């Protein structure tokens, strides 16, 4: 499910093992570690993943609504939420979320509460907002995680606090559990809604189904996103029963093909042993990158990550290295000075070995 906290999706590519010699690691086909897809297409379509979704696209609005209700019923038990709303895009999800929060406050007698504080963090100099927030003059961006600064922004007009548990726009940052816990305390103290943007870090990428589960901090509202290569995008707005009081009818229904892909995704994520497999691959990726980092200290200044979201920090701009890796068949993501590696959940150890070998070769070429 791409926000302005993350890059837009692109066509995923099949996994490969690059052929490496002394001068090149050019791959027969790109190996996509850019985060564009949750699954390698052939893995997702294969019989190893259980997909209980009905066959064929729904032919009527009633069929689509039934498919949507069934998917909501699958998502709610595996999340904190009591209610789930499925929308055709992330922009739609955030617009519905904003109106739901504001309407909730009106219903409980706090009509002045309309402002959203978006905690973008100190690394985001441009303070970009999630899609759907454009043109709303009651959105405030906070470029620090200092708790005193946050409390200074809270006033009688504040309705909600929004943060991404893992930030991936201007760089890469796993927001600490202590920061999220303080936001939860502030929201509870002032009667605010705590919203999490899990459009990139949710749905298993962190090694758990939802990234915030690592911290033990539970939001009131969350938006997640799925953008498969062969189906329309799908966004999920997950909320507590208390907040759902502010829901309005008439929201745009997600497309039938998107709902089918959503069923397949949730069924795969719910397959016994699947999340354990993702965690094992996460540890393997982290181990291999840690070894690379210590071998190539001249190239990288830091390594950070959570699950299948790992980031190598360079002394300068990461874009030149991203371009060189792409030329050799490894797709990554440049985020300022950070090179992001976000493989699909179905990544194999051989894919990780191939990616690390490619990075190692490019580093060796640059040191010559």
Protein language model regions, located:
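Conserved N-terminal phosphate-binding loop of PLP-dependent enzymes in the Aspartate aminotransferase
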Residues: 2-368
């Amino acid at each position: 499910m791409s926000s302005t906290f993350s890059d837009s999706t692109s066509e995923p590519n099949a996994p490969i093992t690059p052929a490496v010699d002394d001068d090149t690691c050019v791959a027969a086909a790109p190996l996509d570690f850019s985060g564009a897809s949750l699954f390698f297409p052939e893995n997702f379509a294969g019989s190893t993943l259980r997909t209980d979704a009905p066959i064929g696209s729904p032919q009527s609005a009633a069929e689509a609504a039934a498919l949507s209700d069934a998917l909501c019923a699958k998502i709610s038990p595996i999340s904190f939420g009591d209610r789930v709303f499925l929308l055709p895009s992330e922009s739609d999800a955030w617009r519905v979320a904003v109106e739901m929060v504001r309407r909730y406050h009106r219903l409980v007698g706090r009509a002045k509460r309309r402002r959203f504080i978006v905690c973008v963090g100190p690394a985001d100099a441009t303070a970009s907002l999630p899609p759907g927030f454009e043109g709303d003059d009651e959105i405030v961006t906070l470029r620090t995680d200092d708790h005193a600064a946050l409390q200074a922004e809270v006033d009688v007009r504040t309705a909600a606090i929004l943060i991404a548990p893992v930030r991936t726009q201007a760089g890469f940052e796993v927001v600490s559990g202590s920061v999220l816990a303080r936001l939860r305390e502030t929201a509870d103290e002032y009667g605010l809604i705590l919203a999490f943007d899990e459009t990139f870090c949710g749905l298993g990428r962190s090694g758990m189904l939802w990234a915030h589960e690592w911290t033990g901090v539970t939001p009131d509202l969350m938006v997640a996103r799925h953008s498969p290569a062969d189906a329309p995008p799908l966004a999920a707005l997950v909320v507590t029963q208390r907040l759902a009081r502010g829901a309005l009818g008439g929201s745009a229904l997600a497309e039938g093909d998107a709902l089918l892909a959503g069923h397949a995704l949730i069924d795969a994520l719910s397959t016994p042993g699947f999340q354990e497999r993702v965690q094992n691959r996460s540890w393997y990726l982290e181990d291999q990158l840690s070894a690379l980092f210590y071998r190539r200290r001249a190239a990288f200044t830091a390594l950070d990550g959570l699950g299948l979201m790992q980031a190598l920090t360079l002394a300068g701009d990461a874009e030149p290295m991203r371009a060189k890796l792409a030329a050799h068949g490894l797709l990554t993501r440049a985020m300022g000075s950070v090179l992001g590696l976000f493989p699909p959940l179905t990544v194999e150890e051989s894919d990780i070995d191939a990616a690390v070998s490619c990075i190692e070769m490019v580093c060796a070429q640059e040191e010559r």
